[in-house]
C-alpha cells in the first residue's frame, strides 16, 4: 500500500515490521493514497 509523507511529500511504501515513519525525513504522519479509480453511483 502506498502512503505519502505529510512533511516531505514523498511516496513511501511501508514494510511489515519497519514501523510507521518516513525513511527520508523521519516524520511519523503518513497519508494514505487514494485509488485513482472513479466510482459512479446511480441515484434514483
From Swiss-Prot:
Annotated compartments:
Cytoplasm
Instruction: Report which residue ranges the record marks as coiled coil.
Output: none
| Upper classification of the organism | Archaea, Methanobacteriati, Methanobacteriota, Stenosarchaea group, Halobacteria
Name its species.
Answer: Haloarcula marismortui (strain ATCC 43049 / DSM 3752 / JCM 8966 / VKM B-1809)
Q: Which family does it belong to?
A: Belongs to the archaeal Rpo12/eukaryotic RPC10 RNA polymerase subunit family.
List the InterPro entries hit by this protein, alphabetically. Answer: RNAP_P/RPABC4, RPABC4/Spt4, Rpo12
One example of the protein's molecular function in GO is: DNA-directed RNA polymerase activity
Q: How does it assemble?
A: Part of the RNA polymerase complex.
Q: Which SMART domains match?
A: RPOLCX (SM00659)
Q: Which gene encodes it?
A: rpo12
Q: Cellular component per GO?
A: cytoplasm; DNA-directed RNA polymerase complex
Q: What is the name listed in the Swiss-Prot or TrEMBL entry for this protein? A: DNA-directed RNA polymerase subunit Rpo12
Name the needed cofactors.
Answer: Zn(2+)
Question: SUPFAM superfamilies this protein is in?
Answer: RNA polymerase subunits
Q: Name one Pfam family in it.
A: Zn_ribbon_RPAB4
Major subcellular location class: cytoplasm
Amino acid at each position: 500500500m502506498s502512503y505519502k509523507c505529510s512533511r516531505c511529500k514523498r511516496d513511501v511504501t511501508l514494510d511489515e515490521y519497519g514501523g510507521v515513519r518516513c525513511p527520508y525525513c523521519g516524520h511519523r504522519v503518513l497519508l494514505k493514497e487514494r485509488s485513482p479509480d472513479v466510482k459512479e453511483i446511480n441515484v434514483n
